[in-house]
Structure formats: structure tokens, C-alpha cells
């Protein structure tokens, strides 16, 4: 009897495995953090072998702790940090270098060269993305141009590229399946979201052999099966995959056009479902694929802020102003405002809607009266301001006024932040009972592919809201606070 779906949630800082039942309830979870590698200023890397080891390890741990056998698992669904780039030798199964993480800025010069060639409009129209070091395409090019023998091996057809979903599926199937889904493909800067194919002109522009690229399939689809000995017992279908933000959109049951969610993780990511329509943003947002099921693809507008929860980690690990992330709610509540302090978390540039690779972090408005509490509160408020920037752009592009915002991710547990978010947006903020919506989205996609859930309506019926935060701020105050934020952002831009 198939009773559960196993979700792999491979994030920027940790590998997690979560077991869900038929009601979408979390049964058991396991998590392991892995190494963050910073070889040079602005560079961020991960060890892909470590990621595979820890991801398979937490999956085994979940099965052992829950006492659930592989025979009871209907399917595995995978959600992953997007854009992070792995290139490996298909004969040895080993990466040619560390994975280049989405936050890494080393390819800024390659991006500038593509812009100088006049490719910005073409890339925008074909991929829905802008030219930025964030996306996978320039990372692949950097590896081919800089890792010894990489280009030679790639041209011989011996190297494979994948984002983390592809890397995990390849390892789970012992190298039998080299595949990705529409959502992950749409984040590479190489995938045409109109034709749903790898774009030969863009591959030529970046000098990337097509033989490296995975096959692209729907987000809800049986890609292959685990080997019997991988987790002991029977083979398990690998039946769903989606980039983390699209998985969260699906996990929040944002199936209708105009519905939106914001994920508060390492970065902050807002997606709005635009249905069958590809909306080309005029306000610095990305157009991306929301999910693909059967022969139907839904699209989304996305705005991403690179740094959100990572700024709280910085308060804890570098400034030592707090011991735990949870304390930020307490300190923020000790003061009525930030005493004029603004924080711009542009540690790795600014994302939507500014897209300034050369912006840097800034703490502004400091006086002798500024205390720890003011700085902590300013960091939390910055997360909410970035979300307002994105929502304002989204409403202009889509011509849809958001009625409510669904939220998820670690920081959505912070009641101060959620209330301030509602206040500054002037819309209700809805927090679900099940906070693991990213993993849940991967589970739903996998479960639908194997008939564990029959259709999207069944998923919608099991959704529960834990708390609704309603706006409680005067319009004049909202405008004044936001004007201060815009001024602070302007000061941080074009710094490096």
C-alpha cells in the first residue's frame, strides 16, 4: 500500500528530506547542512559530491526514523536551489570543479560581453530572463573557458551539465537518466520558453555544446526509478521536479491566474501565476515557467531579492548581535521604529526590480542613538521593503491588484516581519499551517504523476491557513517609510 511521498528539498545551505502523507501533512523530516565555499570575493561554490552524499543520507535517515519502508513510498519529488551549476564527467561521475552557486558573481564580465554584443533583447524575448550572473548559462561558459580540459571534454561529448535536480536524478538512477524539468530549464538563460526547447542561437552565442544539456520534461512526470539498493527494498519512481520557488508556488496551491506567493529563505522570492500568458515585464521582473503538467505549461512573473534570511545570518555570525534567528522578533519588538536606520542587503548586488550587479550592502541613517534593536529591526524591515518593490512592479506588469499574499519559508514564522509585511504592502498576508510548502510542492507534483493525488482540486481542498495578518498602518506613515527605503537603495547602487 502506497501511503507516502518523499520530498527532497535541496537548498542553498542544507539538504532535507521530508515524508508527507495523503493529507499533505509532514510525517518525518531530516536535515544536514553542507559547506559554503568562498574562494574569492563575490564567488560562492558548493561541493556537488557532498550535496549528493548528504541528500541521499537524509533520505535514508527519514526512512529509518519513521519506520516507513520503500514499498510504502508512492514517489520521490525533488525541489532544488535553482541556477546552481554542476558540470561533470559522465564516465567517472565526478564534477570537473565545484558547483557554481546562484549567488556567485564571477561571471559579471561574461554578462557585460553578452550585453555589448547586443543580445539583451533577444535573450529577454526568448528566455524571459535578463542577462545576469545569477543564471546558469554564463556559469557553464565560465567552467568551459577556465577549467583545464573542460572544453575539450565537452566537445567530445564527455561532460554533462545539470542544475541540482538533474545532478540528483542522475545519481539516483546511477547515471541512466539525464533530465530536467521545464522550471529549472527556464532558469538557465539557454531555454526558449515559447518553443520549450534549448535555443541553438543562445548556445552558439555562449559557445556551449548542446550535447551537455539534459532532456527537458514536465514538472510532474516519471523520469526514472531509484536502484533497489539505493534506499534498500524496492525501486521508487522519481516523479516530480521543480525549482524551489516554483515548487513553493505549487505547494501553496497558487493554481489560478493572479495568485501569488512570497518565499522568505536565503533570498526572497515572489512569484505570480500568469496562467497561459507570457507577460514580458517592463519593470525589471523575470518571466518564467511556473510548472508543466501533462501537455500544459503555466507561466509566472518573478521578482527575486538575493539576500533575506542571509542578512539575519550575517547579524548572527558576523556582527554577533544575536545568538539565534528567532531572537530578531524579540529585539524588533523592543522599539517602535528603527530610529531612522535603513539597511540595504545588497551583499551580492541587487535583484528585481533594480538588477544592479555592482550595488553593495549599506547601513544608513546611523546616529549615536542607534542601538542593536534598531539595526535588527532595520534588517527585518528591509526584507519587507524588497518584497514591496517586487509587488509594485508585478502589479504594473500584470495589471492585477493582489488581494492577498501567501507566504512560506523560514522567516515567515517571524510574526513581527509578517505584520510589517502586511502593513507596508497594505494587503492581508496568509501563513499556512504547513510551512514546508517548497517540499510539499515537489511532493504534490510527484504524487500527481503517479496518481497518489488525482487532480489539483484534491490538493486545494487539503490546504489550511494558520494565521492571517491584516494591514494596520496609516497610509501617510506607509508612504514616508517607503520613501526612506527608496532613498537608501539609491545610495547603495553602482558602488563596486
Swiss-Prot record:
Inhibited by fructose 1,6-bisphosphate (FBP). PROSITE patterns: FGGY_KINASES_1, FGGY_KINASES_2. ATP binds at residues 12-14, 266, 309, 313, 410. The keyword Transferase applies. It is an enzyme of class 2 (transferase). Pathway: Polyol metabolism; glycerol degradation via glycerol kinase pathway; sn-glycerol 3-phosphate from glycerol: step 1/1. Glycerol binds at residues 82-83, 134, 244-245. Coiled coil: none annotated. InterPro entries: ATPase_NBD, Carb_kinase_FGGY, Carb_kinase_FGGY_CS, FGGY_C, FGGY_N, Glycerol_kin. Keywords: ATP-binding, Glycerol metabolism, Kinase, Nucleotide-binding, Transferase. Sn-glycerol 3-phosphate binds at residues 12, 82-83, 134, 244. GO terms for cellular component: cytosol. CDD domains: FGGY_EcGK_like (cd07786). ADP binds at residues 12, 16, 266, 309, 410, 414. The keyword Transferase applies. It catalyses: glycerol + ATP = sn-glycerol 3-phosphate + ADP + H(+). GO terms for molecular function: ATP binding; glycerol kinase activity. GO terms for biological process: glycerol catabolic process; glycerol metabolic process; glycerol-3-phosphate metabolic process. It holds the Pfam family FGGY_N. Its EC number is 2.7.1.30. Belongs to the FGGY kinase family. Key enzyme in the regulation of glycerol uptake and metabolism. Catalyzes the phosphorylation of glycerol to yield sn-glycerol 3-phosphate. This is Glycerol kinase. It comes from Treponema denticola (strain ATCC 35405 / DSM 14222 / CIP 103919 / JCM 8153 / KCTC 15104). The lineage of its organism: Bacteria, Pseudomonadati, Spirochaetota, Spirochaetia, Spirochaetales. The gene is glpK.
Amino acid at each position: 500500500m502506497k501511503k507516502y511521498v518523499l520530498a527532497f528539498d535541496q537548498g542553498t545551505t542544507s539538504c532535507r528530506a521530508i515524508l508527507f502523507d495523503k493529507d499533505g501533512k509532514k510525517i518525518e523530516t531530516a536535515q544536514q547542512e553542507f559547506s559554503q565555499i568562498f574562494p574569492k570575493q563575490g564567488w560562492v561554490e558548493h561541493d556537488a559530491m557532498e550535496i549528493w552524499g548528504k541528500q541521499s543520507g537524509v533520505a535514508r535517515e527519514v526512512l529509518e526514523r519513521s519506520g516507513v519502508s520503500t514499498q510504502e513510498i508512492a514517489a520521490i519529488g525533488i525541489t532544488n536551489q535553482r541556477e546552481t551549476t554542476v558540470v561533470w564527467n559522465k564516465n567517472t561521475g565526478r564534477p570537473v570543479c565545484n558547483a557554481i552557486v546562484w549567488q556567485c558573481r564571477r561571471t559579471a564580465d561574461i554578462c557585460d560581453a553578452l550585453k555589448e554584443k547586443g543580445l539583451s533583447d533577444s535573450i529577454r524575448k526568448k528566455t524571459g530572463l535578463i542577462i545576469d550572473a545569477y543564471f546558469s548559462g554564463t556559469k557553464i561558459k565560465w567552467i568551459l573557458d577556465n577549467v583545464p580540459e573542460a572544453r575539450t571534454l565537452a566537445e567530445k561529448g564527455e561532460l554533462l551539465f545539470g542544475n541540482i535536480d538533474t545532478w540528483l536524478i542522475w545519481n539516483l538512477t546511477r547515471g541512466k537518466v539525464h533530465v530536467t524539468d521545464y522550471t529549472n530549464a527556464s532558469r538557465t538563460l539557454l531555454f526558449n520558453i515559447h518553443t520549450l526547447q534549448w535555443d541553438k542561437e543562445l548556445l552558439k552565442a555562449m559557445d556551449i555544446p548542446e550535447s551537455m544539456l539534459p532532456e527537458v520534461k514536465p514538472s510532474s512526470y516519471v523520469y526514472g526509478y531509484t536502484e533497489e539498493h539505493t534506499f534498500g527494498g524496492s525501486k521508487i519512481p522519481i516523479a516530480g521536479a521543480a525549482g524551489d520557488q516554483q515548487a513553493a508556488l505549487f505547494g501553496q496551491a497558487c493554481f489560478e491566474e493572479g495568485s501569488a506567493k512570497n518565499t522568505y529563505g536565503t533570498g526572497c522570492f515572489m512569484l505570480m501565476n500568469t496562467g497561459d500568458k507570457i507577460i514580458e515585464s517592463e519593470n525589471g521582473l523575470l518571466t518564467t515557467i511556473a510548472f508543466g503538467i501533462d501537455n500544459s505549461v503555466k507561466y509566472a512573473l518573478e521578482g527575486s531579492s538575493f539576500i533575506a534570511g542571509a542578512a539575519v545570518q550575517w547579524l548572527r555570525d558576523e556582527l554577533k548581535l544575536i545568538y539565534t534567528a528567532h531572537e530578531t522578533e524579540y529585539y524588533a519588538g523592543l522599539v517602535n521604529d528603527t530610529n531612522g536606520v535603513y539597511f540595504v542587503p545588497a551583499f551580492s548586488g541587487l535583484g528585481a526590480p533594480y538588477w544592479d550587479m555592482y550595488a553593495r550592502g549599506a547601513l544608513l541613517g546611523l546616529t549615536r542613538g542607534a542601538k542593536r534593536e534598531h539595526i535588527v529591526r532595520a534588517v527585518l524591515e528591509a526584507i519587507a521593503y524588497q518584497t514591496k518593490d517586487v509587488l509594485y512592479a508585478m502589479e504594473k506588469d500584470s495589471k492585477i491588484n493582489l488581494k492577498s499574499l501567501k507566504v512560506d519559508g523560514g522567516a515567515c514564522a517571524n510574526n513581527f516581519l509578517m505584520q510589517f509585511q502586511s502593513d507596508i504592502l497594505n494587503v492581508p498576508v496568509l501563513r499556512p499551517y504547513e510551512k514546508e510548502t517548497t517540499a510539499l510542492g515537489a511532493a504534490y507534483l510527484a504524487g500527481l504523476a503517479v496518481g497518489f493525488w488525482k487532480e489539483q482540486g484534491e490538493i486545494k481542498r487539503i490546504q489550511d491557513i494558520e494565521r492571517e495578518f491584516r494591514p494596520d498602518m496609516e497610509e501617510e506613515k506607509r508612504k514616508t517609510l517607503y520613501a526612506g527605503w527608496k532613498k537608501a537603495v539609491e545610495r547603495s547602487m553602482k558602488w563596486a
